[in-house]
Amino acid sequence: MEQNNQLQPPVFNQPQPSGPQYQPRVSASPMMDPVEAVKTCFRKYFDFKGRARRSEYWWFILFIVILSSVFNYGGLLLPFLSYVGMLCSLLLLIPQFAAMTRRLHDTGRSGWWVAILAILYVVVLVSMAILVAPYGTQLFETTDSMVQAEMMADAFQSNPVVATVMTGSALLGLLLMVITFIFTLLDSKWGENKYGPSPKYQ
């Protein structure tokens, strides 16, 4: 029997397989429920480190919105509730900024976005306080919107520098809020990043 012992010519430029050769298997943990999310954000009141998935952050934001609405509408019937609502809003600023920082970390972004937003928020509050200080409590005691508008117009005209700083800070803050809002809608980055392990993909 004749055997074919001829050598086969080498084949060059063979197509190489595309894509990663190893795909790690990851699974998403169940979405955090509202109660657990709120408890987690309060437990991490001053925690600006680590990561937070979307369900943790947005359930907490919904909790803040509902609580603020209750106090705002309740203040129409019982005026003291408005002051309680303002106090609660101030107390919730820190955990809200902390949760937002962890949410940005979860998408692989820096928390400096939140730091700049917080600074602009403080600038707006201080500027507003300087503008309305000459009117004392008159601006808040009157229920006439026309009178309030006239007071604010006089305040802006009497101190144009502070008014300009407040307006510029408010506009820049609004732009940053839109940007960070989009960031917080993004899904978690699977695997560990420089801020810690993924809270969603294990």
Residue ranges of each PLM-predicted region?
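Membrane-interface extramembranous regions at the lipid-water interface
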Residues: 2-3, 9-67, 92-113, 181-202
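Short linear motifs in intrinsically disordered/low-complexity regions
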Residues: 5-6, 14, 145, 155, ...
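Generic signal for short, ordered secondary-structure residues
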Residues: 36-37, 82-83, 154
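Hydrophobic alpha-helical transmembrane segments in multi-pass membrane proteins
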Residues: 55-97, 110-136, 162-185
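Juxtamembrane non-transmembrane "cap" segments at the membrane-aqueous interface
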Residues: 132-150
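Membrane-interface segments at the starts/ends of alpha-helical transmembrane spans
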Residues: 150-166
